[in-house]
């Protein structure tokens, strides 16, 4: 694709608006106020940005996002997807945030403490936080009452439709009962207010305007990590009353209220979002912000590379072909600028669909029978060699991307300092195996030989009428050649690992929304999706796959196992037994509240059971190579929550960072973590 890049006498932002880099202008949504290049410059003044190299920092910054990750909800209380949180985290603050080391730091809460047994947590709030509208005009003052309103909204089934209830109902006294009450009330629950929640005995109170107290069901020494999640964000009753429940639930950048570091200057759906500083941000004096931050939607990494070369982007991740182009030419200027990023705090997995439909809406019985078979699923975890596919994400060190666990590494540690996934590895029997750059760890025991499992699966499935090869339908966004290239490599991995007589990958496309076009009609055989923790405990991962829980995200929205449980077929009996056993193990682990080590050991057993039965098949960690004008190690790096894309205190440079500089950043970061 040829792109007519602009001359340097107009701004980069003007180019992006005019070029329509993803091919569709979408809907223009903007609020009032100046659109000049100086807009927000006064509000941006505050703390100096970090500068460890003496470089000239950037005042404006242009980042990117994949075209298939467009924001779908601007309401953090309602949304459960990271692609939404990555946007709205810049607009809406909660009790706490995080620093570049992943440590909890104050946001609207200035400090917090727990009682002796960690059942009562008290948060002390700032007295200088305001809601502003999309024009940056102050609308209301934020007090502890706004957090009561926010929690009532989340717990009210009529208002928030069961979204984001798992954290409060799991931990807060009376929260589950209040949620069930509103669920039973139906539409009438829409009339309830926060006082009704308090009267029902939910364990939250506001003794004064700037104090918030939570009472937990059981001792919870990590509750501060729970309270950092969006379930506990504030909301304004004034705005809810003004918009009405349905409009507030579906609010957008033009009618929402802001209390974060930025407001949206302009939003062109499917194209760009531009943010300017919130002129009334409470922490303006203590954080650095950009005068303008633009996020460009990118449908193709080849286009992204062209944009970066012309300084229409300030950072890009590099795919395999671009790295090959750079490294194959010793004179290429970018050879010295290749920067390996740290792993994003997400664990990606292959989420099987246990109730797949055909395009005409009829059940895909062949797939549904096959995926219900244990031996069939075990072939994915024990035999699918993904090294070539990992190379699409990390050409230089592909096996650094290998993920053998459902829970993300680094989420939590027991009292002996043992990282949780090492407990899972011990249960799985490969705790002694280390990264060698050559072979996937989970394939070493049998060399990836699944001939016996394959024979068993084909015999058992043939007996109930399954025909081979089984077609595994995998959807990618139609506009991305990079996604097609990735899928082509994945298809070859299937062929090499399974044989074309057993399982064949069928690559299909969707236009713009995976949710609306694929997941809702249940057309996929599997989706490869990442989960970032909401708080610092394994239940936040493992609880998403359990039965009998309205809040189990993947069970309801990806695997559809919750629907299968309503009326399982005979061939799904063993599958349901496995999910019931897994659910029991998770619930038993979750019930251990006074012994952290025993709790994590029990969760590790539950996770090992999940992996042995391959209810989900882990795939990769996102460890990319990049070209960048931002120091990745200066950005927020939280292991949980949705704050990592909050653009404050970023170290940037007019000149691109070099490989050597990034190695120095990594060493300094590791030393700070270990020290």
Residue ranges, per PLM feature:
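N-terminal secretory signal peptides
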Residues: 1-10, 14, 18-28
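N-terminal lobe/hinge region of extracytoplasmic solute-binding protein
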Residues: 63-117, 257
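Extracellular/periplasmic solute-recognition and catalytic clefts
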Residues: 67, 265-279, 294-361, 387, ...
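Aromatic- and charge-enriched surface segment that lines or borders ligand/interaction sites
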Residues: 110-175, 213, 304-307, 366-372, ...
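Alpha-helical secondary-structure segments
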Residues: 139, 143-149, 209-215, 261, ...
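Gly/Pro-rich hinge or "lid" segments in bacterial periplasmic/extracellular proteins
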Residues: 187-201, 207-211, 215-294, 655-675
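Ligand/substrate-recognition segments at binding pockets and active sites
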Residues: 269, 307, 397-398, 434-533, ...
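Detector for C-terminal structural segments
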Residues: 379-426, 478, 482-492, 518-675
């Amino acid at each position: 694709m040829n792109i007519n890049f602009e001359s340097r006498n107009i701004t980069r932002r003007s180019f992006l608006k005019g070029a329509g880099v993803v091919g569709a202008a979408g809907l223009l949504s903007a609020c009032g106020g100046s659109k000049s290049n100086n807009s927000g410059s006064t509000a941006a003044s505050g703390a100096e940005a970090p500068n460890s190299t003496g470089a000239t920092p950037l005042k404006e910054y242009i980042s990117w996002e994949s075209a298939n990750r467009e924001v779908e909800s601007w309401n953090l209380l309602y949304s459960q997807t990271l692609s939404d949180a990555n946007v709205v985290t810049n607009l809406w603050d909660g009790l706490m945030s995080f620093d570049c080391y992943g440590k909890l730091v104050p946001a609207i809460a200035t400090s917090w403490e727990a009682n002796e047994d960690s059942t009562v947590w008290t948060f002390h709030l700032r007295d200088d936080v305001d809601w502003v509208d999309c024009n940056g005009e102050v609308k209301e003052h934020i007090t502890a009452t706004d957090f009561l309103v926010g929690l009532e909204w989340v717990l009210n089934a009529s208002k928030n439709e069961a979204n984001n209830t798992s954290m409060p109902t799991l931990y807060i006294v009376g929260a589950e009962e209040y949620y069930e009450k509103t669920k039973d009330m139906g539409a009438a629950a829409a009339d309830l207010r926060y006082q009704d929640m308090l009267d029902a005995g939910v364990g939250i109170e506001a003794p004064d305007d700037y104090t918030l107290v939570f009472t937990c069901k059981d001792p919870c020494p990590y509750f501060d990590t729970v309270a950092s999640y969006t379930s506990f964000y504030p909301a304004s009753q004034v705005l809810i009353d003004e918009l009405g429940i349905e409009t507030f639930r579906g609010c957008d950048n033009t009618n929402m209220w802001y209390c974060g570091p930025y407001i949206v200057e302009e939003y062109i759906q499917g194209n760009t979002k531009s943010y300017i500083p919130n002129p009334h941000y409470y922490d303006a004096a203590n954080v650095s912000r950009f005068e303008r931050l633009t996020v460009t939607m990118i449908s193709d990494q080849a286009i992204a590379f062209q944009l970066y070369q012309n300084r229409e982007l300030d950072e890009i991740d590099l795919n395999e072909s671009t790295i090959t182009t750079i490294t194959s030419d010793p004179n290429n200027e970018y050879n010295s600028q290749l920067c390996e990023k740290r792993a994003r705090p997400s664990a990606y997995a292959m989420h099987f669909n246990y109730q797949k439909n055909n395009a005409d809406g009829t059940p895909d019985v062949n797939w549904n029978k096959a995926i219900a078979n244990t031996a069939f699923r075990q072939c994915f975890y024990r035999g699918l060699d993904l090294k070539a596919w990992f190379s699409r994400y990390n050409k230089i060190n592909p096996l650094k991307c290998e993920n053998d666990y459902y829970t993300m590494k680094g989420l939590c540690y027991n009292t002996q300092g043992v990282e949780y996934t090492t407990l899972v590895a011990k249960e799985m029997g490969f705790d002694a195996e280390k990264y060698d750059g050559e072979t996937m760890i989970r394939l070493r025991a049998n060399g990836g030989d699944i001939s016996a499992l394959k024979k068993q699966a084909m015999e058992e499935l043939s007996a109930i009428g399954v025909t081979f090869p089984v077609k595994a339908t995998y959807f990618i966004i139609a506009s991305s050649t990079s996604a097609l290239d990735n899928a082509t490599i994945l298809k070859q991995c299937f062929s090499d690992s399974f044989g074309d007589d057993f399982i064949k990958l069928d690559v299909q496309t969707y236009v713009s929304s995976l949710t609306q076009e694929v997941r809702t009609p249940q057309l996929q055989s599997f989706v490869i999706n990442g989960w970032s923790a909401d708080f610092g405990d394994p239940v936040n991962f493992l609880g998403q796959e359990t039965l009998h829980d309205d809040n189990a995200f993947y069970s309801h929205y990806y695997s559809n196992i919750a629907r299968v449980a309503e009326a399982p077929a005979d061939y799904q009996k063993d599958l349901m037994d496995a999910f019931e056993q897994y659910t029991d193990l998770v619930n038993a682990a979750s019930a251990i509240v006074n012994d952290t080590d025993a709790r994590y050991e029990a969760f590790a057993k539950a996770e090992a059971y999940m992996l042995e039965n391959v209810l989900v098949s882990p795939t990769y960690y996102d460890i990319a190579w990049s070209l960048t004008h931002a120091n990745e190690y200066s950005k927020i790096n939280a292991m949980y929550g949705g704050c990592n894309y909050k653009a404050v205190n970023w170290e940037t440079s007019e000149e691109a960072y070099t490989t050597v500089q990034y190695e120095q950043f990594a060493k300094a970061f590791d030393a700070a973590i270990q020290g």
